[in-house]
């Protein structure tokens, strides 16, 4: 867990150091909801625009299950179909899900890797602030649909 947080902070730092133009880098705070099993999670991530209409968007979600502990790491590629105030995009990437039904017990963590794909929209409300919604399917286990709603800060 500490390694994941360290890697995420390092990636954010590296992206801040290289993004020079306004709008090239965004930070996101969101809530995730698994539609089939009614599971809520808190999400944090960033987005870096490396080419016209393309961005790399890693994020980390900590889920709040009824029993145990679970979290997931996403590394997504986004392609923006529209520009302007309402920006619609396609998303696809890698997801790894970790589940521990007995926290504190060594060797009890279940790890599932898979792909995800979906669609999202970014609504540009102000110069440095916006709202994001995203719907995607994750391929692990039962092809879990996830809905994300959050706020985005442009740096």
Regions found by a protein language model. Give the residues of each.
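Membrane-embedded beta-strand positions of outer-membrane beta-barrel proteins
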Residues: 27-31, 44, 58, 75, ...
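Repeated loop/turn-to-beta-strand initiation elements of outer-membrane beta-barrel proteins
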Residues: 25, 53-58, 85-88, 123-131
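Solvent-exposed loop/turn segments connecting transmembrane beta-strands
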Residues: 30-42, 63-71, 110-112, 136-147
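Flexible, solvent-exposed loop segments that connect beta-strands
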Residues: 24-29, 58-73, 98-115, 155
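Cleavable N-terminal export/targeting peptides
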Residues: 1-23
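Residue-level signature of outer-membrane beta-barrel architecture
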Residues: 33, 48, 79-81, 96, ...
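Outer-membrane beta-barrel "beta-signal"
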Residues: 77-79, 117, 122, 143-155
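Short glycine/proline- and aromatic-enriched beta-strand/turn motifs that initiate or cap beta-hairpins
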Residues: 19-65, 154
């Amino acid at each position: 867990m500490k390694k994941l947080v360290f890697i995420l902070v390092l990636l954010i730092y590296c992206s801040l150091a290289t993004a020079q133009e306004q709008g090239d880098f965004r930070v996101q705070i969101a809530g995730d909801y698994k539609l089939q099993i009614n599971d809520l999670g808190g999400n944090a991530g960033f987005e870096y625009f490396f080419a016209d209409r393309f961005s790399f968007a890693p994020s980390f979600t900590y889920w709040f299950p009824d029993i145990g502990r679970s979290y997931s790491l996403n590394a997504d590629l986004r392609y923006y179909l529209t520009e302007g105030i309402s920006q619609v995009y396609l998303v696809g990437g890698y997801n790894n899900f970790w589940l521990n039904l007995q926290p504190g017990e060594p060797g009890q963590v279940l790890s599932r890797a898979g792909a995800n794909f979906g669609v999202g929209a970014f609504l540009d409300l102000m110069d440095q602030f916006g709202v994001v919604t995203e719907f995607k399917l994750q391929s692990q286990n039962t092809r879990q649909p996830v809905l994300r709603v959050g706020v985005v800060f442009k740096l």
